Amino acid sequence: GANSAAHIAILELNKQYGLNIEPVHYRGEAPMWTGLMEGTLDAAMGSYTAAQPVLQSNLGVPFAVHSKKVDALPKVKTLPEQGATSKFFTVSGFTGWSLPKATPQPIVDRLAQLCVAANSDPKVKEVLATFVLEPTLGFKETNALYQHELPIWMESAKSLGLEPV
């Protein structure tokens, strides 16, 4: 979608390499991956999980991952390993839990502790591995990651002329 990690990544690649890849914004990944399989798209960028129909049918080949190697795709290099230099290619693109701002801090802390504790559960480990997801971080770790990466997102968005949607 507009201003998503995939959108910014495409624009950063265009900027660095003088390309003219046109981002096409879909309402979800399923129709995008379907478009790739049908041949109406030349390339697509999204999550490993949603790409499974493409990967399993051999109708698409992964050629890059964002900033961190993916165990399920050990031969696929990251964009920085392939020469991409934007700071944006160092962000993790994490998914986080959110609560209303008025939630008392002890409740936030307790829920964060429970989420981190769940990382040890064998069923949770299996789900994380299946969907190629990282274990949940604690509240302080998540906040530190957010504070570190937000300026990078904002710098990329500003330099690319993106406006909030």
Predicted feature locations:
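Conserved, function-defining micro-sites of small-solute handling proteins
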Residues: 1-165
